């Protein structure tokens, strides 16, 4: 049995030299932002600053607030990593990554700026006409009217009275509390759970199915492999380094997206990627955009660039090549799958008269037929790992992508072999890093013990809608849609409560969202900064950043390598409060504080989470330090046994599919699904199928809108988080979100790096700063996801966004009736040079405020 002293030894043994220089003071983030490479232990992942980017303009001030805390060094954490916060004179001076972080994030100094951000929500605020008229003010003025500062008591009274009014008049189903978003790290300060805890005590709310990240894949994969596939531990990187003979990164860029974790991270994937690189494993990156990971693997990585949205056609053609050349692993197909005959009949053209040959696919995807054939044979002949990303399924008919990946891997026969098969979470939260022996750390639940006024949080009145369809729901109450084999009728949403998220960055078709957002009677937002979502709210509640409160979190969503004490570094700035304080006070107003708190304060809850985990660890033979020891040290790390380092995804299934069946109806991989066939959906057949999207490079409308738009993840942000910090602002061009464009396309349009372009789709237009690069197909452009919406005309639909918010351009239709996922990457645009005057970016400064009597 390991004792607590052994655990501290584990922590010491895990320590490696920090790979970044000592961080500078928060206000001098200019130098940190200039760093153009991310240093991994033993190697470098290239993140080049592309030509045309401007020097950082510190035109916005990040004033340091006041604090009563003295000089100190405290431990804290965020989605970007674990760090020591240096406080001097009550102000954050810098953040230093912990010495055992394998690849410290470049964003730490941006995090240090968060409490002092120019866009910080400083006080409780209410839209002027709403303060005067309440819900009768209507939604017309949202996004354009000034705000009035109010007291916390007034703001919470308004929220409490509205929650009660809407519940009593329309029922709790009329309150939308899905509140999707990444929030801040921390198991207590979970903004969404705390908010939903209050809503549940109030009788319930309408929630959502799924998420934006994996809307299609997480619905289709349970039919195919019996589990969601996208949020599961992956075959260990160590196994890949030893056994994998070909790594195929299809639409994935683990160097960018593994900078963050749903909890916190010490970037273990960096070590895994280094092992794979040193082992000399050949890598193929399939992506219209050359990923940073391809730069990391260098000459050992080949880049194949299909047209966006055509991956399924390319994979089906690979299946045709394997079948007609006699290379399919028929023993694997026979033993571990069902439905192959019906699928291959479609591939060979027996169903529709069209053989899905590599030559057929070349006309669709733009990849040469010979290259498609070669890739098919390489994947069959070598033990290959198909590392699938998520952006490729954020598209119309996106369900087909990961289904077809599984089928292709099955035809190659490597599923369940060490280092082979498929993995759909290597690029997320450091999937593939070995899992420790420690128990999962608990957190605050959205489901409290009791209800209020006889109303339980469980009830038939509650509704759930697909997340990406909430705009459609707001606009069309009573409408019935298909979803995953059932019918859903939209409720009539009268109140929206969003906490710790930014739907104006997440939801497609911003102009459609503006129209929908104005329909409910009341909108409430609780956040730390003035996102567009907050600017379009009636009531705005200022929350603390994670540097201004206490919390606890675990290290690694999959690895669970340790726990971190998130110690308060500075006092809450202005009149912000912790999310727990906000919702405790709201519950007090509503008469159920006791049920909300269960008699515990913030440190009481944190202690409960830790000590419950310690009890479970003890049962499993692991002795954790006392809570007092843990909190004083700031963290504890856990051992990883050898079995975890040898983990092989679906290995048990391959060894014995009868004893270890999958969770599908057949217990096997379902290439053809009878269940999906029974739904009779016209947009999601019963086996993987190529279907043309409404918008793609092969559509008629591409004559007017000739560029496919990719909305890839930014290395400078987590979705829209950190958009107003110096690190992200440095990446901008002329203060605009960049648009990446190929040199050939730029030449035809008369564009060069450093110019500003107007990018237009059928939904709207944005301004973006031009970066010319050969890392993108000539017929494709990239505007990275998450730039804040900054309209030319406040609150108006259809106005020009002058900052480069990608979702102004994207289309808002369901991927199919099966998952109703979002389709952000099924968008066509046109581009023209912008020579007119440039409007200032207002998204990163305070909104207009007035006095109540003005």
What are these regions (language model features)?
Residues 207, 328-331, 372-373, 385-386, ...:
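Acidic/polar loop patches that form or flank catalytic/metal-binding clefts of enzymes
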Residues 573, 578-633, 720, 726-740, ...:
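Long, contiguous, secondary-structure-rich segments that constitute the structural scaffold
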């Amino acid at each position: 049995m390991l004792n607590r002293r052994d655990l501290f030894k584990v922590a010491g043994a895990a320590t490696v030299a920090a790979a970044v220089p000592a961080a500078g003071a928060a206000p001098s983030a200019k130098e940190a932002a200039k760093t153009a490479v991310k240093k991994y232990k033993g190697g470098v992942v290239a993140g080049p600053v592309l030509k045309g980017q401007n020097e950082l303009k510190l035109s916005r001030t990040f004033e340091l607030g006041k604090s009563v805390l003295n000089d100190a060094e405290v431990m804290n954490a965020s989605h970007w990593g674990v760090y020591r916060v240096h406080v001097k004179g009550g102000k954050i001076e810098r953040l230093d990554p912990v010495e055992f972080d394998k690849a410290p994030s470049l964003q730490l100094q941006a995090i240090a700026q968060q409490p002092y951000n120019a866009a910080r929500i400083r006080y409780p605020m209410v839209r002027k006409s709403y303060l005067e008229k309440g819900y009768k003010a209507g939604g017309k003025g949202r996004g354009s009217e000034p705000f009035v500062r109010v007291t916390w008591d007034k703001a919470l009274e308004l929220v409490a009275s509205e929650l009660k009014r809407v519940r009593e008049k329309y029922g709790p189903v009329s309150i939308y509390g899905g509140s999707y978003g990444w929030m801040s790290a921390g198991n207590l300060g979970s903004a969404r759970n705390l908010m939903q805890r209050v809503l549940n005590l109030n009788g319930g709310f309408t929630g959502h199915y799924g998420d934006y990240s994996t809307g299609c894949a997480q619905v289709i994969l349970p039919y195919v492999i019996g589990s969601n596939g996208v949020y599961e531990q992956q075959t260990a990187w160590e196994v890949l380094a030893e056994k994998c003979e070909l790594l195929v990164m299809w639409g994935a860029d683990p160097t960018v997206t593994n900078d963050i974790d749903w909890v916190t991270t010490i970037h273990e994937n960096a070590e895994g990627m280094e092992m794979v690189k040193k082992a000399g494993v050949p890598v193929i990156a399939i992506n219209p955009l050359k990923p940073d990971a391809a730069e990391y693997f260098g000459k050992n990585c080949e880049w194949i660039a299909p047209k966006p949205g055509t991956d399924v056609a390319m994979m089906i053609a690979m299946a045709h090549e394997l079948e007609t050349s006699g290379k399919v692993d028929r023993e694997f197909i026979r033993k571990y799958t069902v439905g192959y005959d019906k699928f291959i009949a479609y591939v060979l053209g027996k169903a529709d008269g069209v053989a899905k040959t590599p030559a057929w696919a070349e006309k669709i995807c733009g990849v040469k037929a010979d290259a498609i054939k070669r890739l098919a044979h390489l994947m069959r002949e070598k033990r290959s790992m198909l590392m699938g990303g998520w952006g490729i399924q954020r598209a119309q008919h996106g369900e087909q992508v990961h289904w077809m990946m599984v089928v292709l891997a099955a035809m190659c026969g490597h599923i369940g072999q060490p280092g082979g098969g498929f993995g759909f979470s290597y690029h997320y939260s450091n999937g593939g890093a070995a899992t420790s022996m420690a128990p999962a750390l608990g957190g605050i639940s959205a489901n409290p013990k009791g209800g209020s006024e006889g109303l339980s949080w469980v009830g038939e009145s509650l509704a759930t809608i697909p997340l990406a369809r909430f705009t459609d729901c707001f606009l069309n109450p009573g409408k019935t849609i298909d979803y995953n084999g059932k019918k859903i009728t939209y409720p009539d949403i009268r109140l929206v409560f969003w906490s710790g998220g930014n739907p104006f960055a997440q939801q497609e078709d911003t102009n459609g969202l503006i129209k929908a957002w104005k329909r409910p009677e009341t909108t409430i937002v609780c956040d730390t900064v003035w996102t567009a979502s907050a600017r379009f709210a009636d009531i705005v509640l200022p929350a603390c950043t994670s540097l201004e409160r206490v919390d606890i979190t675990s290290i690694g969503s999959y690895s669970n390598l340790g726990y971190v004490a998130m110690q308060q570094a500075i006092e809450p700035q202005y009149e912000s409060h912790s999310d727990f304080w906000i919702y405790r006070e709201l519950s007090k107003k509503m008469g159920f504080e006791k049920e909300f708190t269960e008699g515990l304060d913030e440190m009481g809850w944190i202690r409960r989470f830790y000590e419950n985990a310690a009890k479970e660890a003890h049962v499993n033979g692991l002795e954790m330090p006392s809570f007092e020891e843990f909190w004083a040290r700031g963290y504890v790390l856990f051992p990883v046994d050898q079995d975890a380092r040898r983990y092989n995804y679906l290995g048990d299934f391959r060894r014995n599919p009868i004893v270890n069946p999958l969770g599908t109806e057949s217990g096997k991989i379902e290439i053809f699904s009878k269940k999906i066939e029974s739904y009779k959906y016209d947009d999601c057949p019963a086996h993987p199928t190529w279907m043309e999207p409404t918008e793609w490079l092969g559509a008629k409308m591409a004559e007017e809108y000739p560029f496919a738009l990719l909305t890839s993840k930014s290395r400078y942000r987590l979705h829209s988080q950190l958009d107003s910090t110096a690190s992200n602002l440095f990446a901008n061009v002329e203060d605009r979100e960049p648009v990446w464009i190929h040199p050939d396309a730029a030449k035809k349009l008369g564009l060069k790096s450093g110019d500003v372009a107007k990018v237009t789709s059928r939904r709207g237009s944005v301004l973006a700063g031009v970066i010319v690069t050969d890392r993108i197909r000539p017929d494709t452009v990239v505007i990275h996801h998450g730039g804040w919406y900054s309209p030319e005309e406040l609150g108006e639909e259809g106005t020009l966004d002058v900052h480069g918010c990608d979702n102004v351009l994207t289309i808002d239709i369901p991927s199919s009736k099966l998952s109703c996922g979002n389709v952000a990457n099924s968008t066509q645009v046109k581009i023209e040079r912008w020579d007119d005057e440039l409007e200032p970016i207002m998204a990163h400064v305070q909104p207009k405020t007035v006095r109540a009597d003005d």
